[in-house]
């Protein structure tokens, strides 16, 4: 009840100041700006800080046995000005215990076998550590700008593979969020204690990882990071193919179904330990199989340095779509690196692993099989787009989902246009991202800025379609070049950090050189929707005036499609800037000496909730 009241107060205050277009912020956010960790200029404040850690993780398994055993050493650095007397540990695997994790029949989660902090045994009770957060008290406080070392041994039984992690089949496993980790401690919320219940996603610090995965012979491992010992775990021919793929634009079949049947791809030790390294990244994930095909190639993502990113795919031989995944990803990385966001793909690799989740991880994608190749490519495009948001930008997915899903949805449309043409991409975007929202009920609509855990209606709309439309509306208003300049300002300011919505707003204003408060207020701080009405078309001495009413409220672009009496047509585009002075009623002037026969207002992908009032003269409804 207190949470609802607080949100209501925030939004009530926002509406009270609507005339001034104030971008209201909660007290804890305002406090971060006041303390100097955030800046109204868009960049991190002079006193900005963030914590990080080094993880050295060793995992072992022996499929089809689903028991996963791990040990890890963590060096955690407290860069904050605060003295930490406890650490909050994230145990995401416990999400599989369900909504009643303490019930006697609840599935088992992760079990910590031993935990030491700075060499001393820490207090840990597995019977209490059943949720996705567990606070650990420190015997000695962790002082500002100091570090500590943790050693943890743990095990758990892998769940079924229908979600973001689990057993895909009896000998194909996907491990994600599989290790205890220190949660984010930041400058505006302190410890991130947001429970993970399976719906919302994640928020992690940028850390360095060493990952060792021990599996029986003939099992291949794919993981976040760069493989350190290919010549130890692969037979020479397959190590040679892998190395060749690092400079090849064409797909190289590292391991085919025939190769797998021969059972001579890996070193023939009883077990092999695959070792991976990655730096300044927010998480690691891995896939394991003894019967998945392995394709690979690479692509130049940075023309200045000629840096290449490795592209790999792991999949069942019967999945025709995955045979195309390396080729698809080659196009994806090339397009994203050179168009929008127009930032070279920031990591050394991407791998698509066949599973069930259609889910992104740093350098990894867990995608389901589909017979529709166009849809398969679109899904992979969307998941790889998440490389930038959140994995490059470090946003809080669990609290501000629109800061990553909205961008991935936007890039999905833009690259889809390049791949399939504007008409097909627009139609998919409307059907998959917009129509259900815009034609649905709006009485319970909540502003996009609403923290994701507090969205009680239309959470998917607030995370995907609505924010994506806001980004596209801004692109339409600023124009491609200025929009890209502003976006790069935001990304340059905040990559590898932890931006919040107000950092985005301030960076985009700074990068564009324009005061966009009115636009951001309209799109993010109101419960608006899309519904324009063409109320009147009036002849004037120089042409015509179109009188439009913005019933829904969002500042959207639109086309005025004019049909003249002589049969000719003209389309006049209006960007969202037309709504800056008056967001409810505007007049659009049409200069012409021709007689207008009819006018239709069409928003394209900005789908109108009620098209019946978008045409003049008004067409009588059929009886």
Regions found by a protein language model. Name each.
Residues 24-88:
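Early extracytoplasmic/domain-onset interaction patches
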Residues 25-40, 53, 276, 311-547:
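Hydrophobic alpha-helical and helix-loop surface patches within well-folded domains
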Residues 26, 67, 77, 104-171, ...:
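A surface-exposed beta-strand-loop module
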Residues 72-74, 91, 146-160, 209-217, ...:
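Short, hydrophobic/aromatic-enriched beta-strand segments in well-ordered soluble domains
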Residues 84-120, 214-219, 563, 568-574:
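Solvent-exposed beta-hairpin/edge-strand motifs
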Residues 99-106, 155-209, 229-230, 605-623:
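Glycine/proline-rich low-complexity spacer/linker segments in large multi-domain proteins
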Residues 222, 537-602:
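Beta-strand-rich binding/interaction modules
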């Amino acid at each position: 009840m207190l949470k609802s009241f607080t949100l209501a107060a925030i939004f009530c205050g926002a509406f009270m100041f609507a005339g001034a277009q104030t971008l209201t912020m909660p007290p804890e956010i305002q406090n971060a700006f006041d303390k100097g960790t955030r800046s109204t200029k868009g960049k991190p404040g002079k006193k900005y800080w963030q914590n990080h850690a080094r993880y050295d993780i060793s995992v072992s398994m022996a499929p089809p046995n689903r028991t996963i055993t791990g040990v890890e050493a963590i060096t955690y650095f407290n860069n904050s000005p605060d003295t930490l007397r406890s650490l909050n540990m994230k145990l995401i695997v416990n999400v599989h215990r369900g909504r009643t994790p303490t019930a006697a029949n609840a599935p088992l989660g992760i079990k910590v076998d031993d935990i030491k902090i700075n060499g001393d045994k820490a207090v840990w009770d597995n019977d209490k550590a059943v949720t996705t957060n567990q606070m650990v008290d420190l015997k000695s406080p962790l002082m500002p700008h100091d570090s500590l070392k943790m050693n943890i041994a743990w095990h758990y039984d892998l769940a079924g593979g229908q979600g973001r992690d689990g057993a895909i089949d009896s000998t194909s496993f996907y491990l994600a969020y599989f290790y205890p980790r220190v949660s984010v401690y930041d400058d505006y919320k302190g410890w991130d204690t947001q429970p993970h219940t399976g719906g919302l996603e994640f928020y992690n610090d940028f850390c360095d990882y060493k990952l060792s995965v021990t599996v029986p012979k003939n099992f291949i491992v794919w993981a976040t990071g760069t493989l350190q010992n290919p010549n130890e775990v692969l037979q020479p021919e397959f190590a040679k193919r892998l190395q060749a793929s690092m400079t090849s634009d064409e797909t190289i079949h590292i391991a085919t179904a025939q190769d797998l049947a021969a059972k001579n791809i890996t070193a023939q030790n009883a077990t092999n330990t695959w070792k991976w390294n990655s730096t300044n990244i927010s998480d690691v994930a891995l896939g394991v199989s003894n019967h998945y095909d392995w394709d690979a190639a690479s692509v130049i993502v940075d023309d200045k340095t000629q840096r290449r990113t490795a592209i790999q795919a792991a999949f069942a031989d019967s999945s025709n779509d995955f045979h195309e995944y390396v080729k698809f990803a080659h196009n994806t990385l090339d397009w994203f690196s050179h168009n929008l966001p127009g930032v070279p793909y920031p990591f050394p690799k991407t791998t698509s692993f066949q599973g069930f989740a259609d889910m992104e991880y740093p350098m990894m994608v867990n995608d389901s099989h589909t017979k529709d190749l166009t849809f398969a490519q679109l899904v992979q495009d969307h998941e790889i787009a998440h490389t930038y948001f959140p994995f490059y930008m470090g946003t809080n997915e669990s609290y501000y989902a629109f800061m990553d899903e909205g961008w991935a949805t936007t890039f999905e449309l833009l690259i889809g246009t390049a791949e399939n043409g504007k008409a097909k991409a627009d139609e998919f975007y409307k059907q998959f991202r917009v129509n259900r929202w815009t034609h649905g009920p709006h009485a319970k609509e909540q502003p996009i800025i609403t923290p994701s855990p507090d969205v009680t209606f239309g959470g998917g709309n607030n995370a995907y379609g609505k924010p994506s439309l806001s980004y596209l509306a801004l692109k339409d208003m600023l124009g491609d070049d200025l929009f890209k300049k502003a976006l790069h300002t935001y990304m340059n300011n905040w990559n590898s950090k932890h931006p919040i919505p107000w950092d985005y707003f301030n960076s985009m204003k700074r990068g564009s050189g324009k005061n966009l408060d009115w636009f951001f207020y309209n799109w993010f701080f109101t419960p608006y929707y899309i519904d324009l009405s063409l109320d009147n078309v009036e002849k004037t001495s120089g042409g015509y005036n179109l009188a439009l009413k913005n019933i829904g409220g969002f500042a959207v672009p639109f086309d005025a499609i004019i049909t003249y009496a002589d049969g000719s047509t003209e389309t006049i585009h209006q960007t969202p800037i037309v709504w800056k002075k008056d967001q409810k009623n505007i007049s659009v002037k049409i200069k012409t000496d021709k007689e207008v026969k009819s006018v239709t207002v069409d928003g394209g992908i900005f789908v109108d909730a009620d098209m019946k009032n978008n045409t003049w003269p008004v067409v009588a409804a059929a009886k």
